[in-house]
């Protein structure tokens, strides 16, 4: 996993998380969940594995999405020493 892949993931997830947690529009939140799940499917497998920590439906489960994206952003911040 490269620093560039970590920075890219952080930029995308941080921005989408901010909009997601402040949005009250269900269609917008659904669109963000879809975009993040699609991004996760193309993410570096090593990076995704580190973030998911064995959770198979990480960033793909509607019921745990806010928790998952918050965890991912937190871990990425630690990896980048932010």
Language-model region placement:
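Short terminal alpha-helical segments
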Residues: 1-27
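Residue-level marker of intrinsically disordered, low-complexity segments enriched
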Residues: 4, 17-19, 30, 34, ...
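Charged, amphipathic alpha-helical oligomerization/scaffolding segments
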Residues: 8, 12, 31, 35-38, ...
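Amphipathic alpha-helical binding modules
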Residues: 8, 54-82
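A structural signal for well-ordered alpha-helices, especially hydrophobic packing surfaces
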Residues: 17, 21, 40-44, 62, ...
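Acidic, low-complexity, intrinsically disordered interaction modules
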Residues: 25-66
